Amino acid sequence: LKKQKMRHCSSYHVLLLFGFSFFLPAQGSDPWNQFRGPNGSGIRADASIGVPSVDDLLWKTPLPFGLSCPVLSEDKIFLTGMENKSLLTIALDKESGKILWKKKAPKTEIEKFHPSSSPVTPTPFVDGKRLYVYFGSYGLICYDHQGLEIWKKPLPTPRSLYGTASSPLVYKNLLIQVIDDDAHMPNSQVSRSRILALDKESGEIIWERFRPFHRSGWSTPTIWEH
């Protein structure tokens, strides 16, 4: 497990250092503020992709074990990690790589997860004012950019063979989260599989759609406007 933690920690270093110029948004471009960037597409039309070298190294910062992707505000980088069984939300200064703050989620039993996964896999969503984080072991937490907790919403831990991976999404005033249980897992309640939409300002549930026959899923929703 120690080797596994070190491997995930190192992968963060590479992402932050050598992928940094790709993720820096140009003025007026769509922000890289969610899983896979603008609307989850994985595409930045104005990005210039080159082969990184040691000369491109700006800074490096050791980080805890985890698999979430970094998301960017104007001057900060946000991601999650796990340290000493604590679920962490982490903010770094974009220019220097300095860790600005770490916030622990409320103490909870850590969900079961596959050795190649982690309980800190979902990627946060950040907008101009707030940061939204989902941990399968706990639920949703909203912070401001300075790390002040705005609200939290405990949710039942999804049951699956591999752990949780679905990331939160913001659309207008809604925070959307997919929560899927595996109907074929022992003690699993298939009726708990659902999509939630919460008021992003308060964490109050606005609507939910049940998926009673859906097995485990790890996808993150995207918005289709038509």
Go through the PLM ranges and name each one.
Residues 2-15:
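Bacterial N-terminal signal peptides that target proteins for export
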Residues 8-10, 20, 28, 201:
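Intrinsically disordered, low-complexity segments enriched in Ser/Pro/Gly/Ala and basic residues
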Residues 13-23:
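Bacterial N-terminal signal peptides
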Residues 26-226:
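Noncatalytic, solvent-exposed loop/strand surfaces
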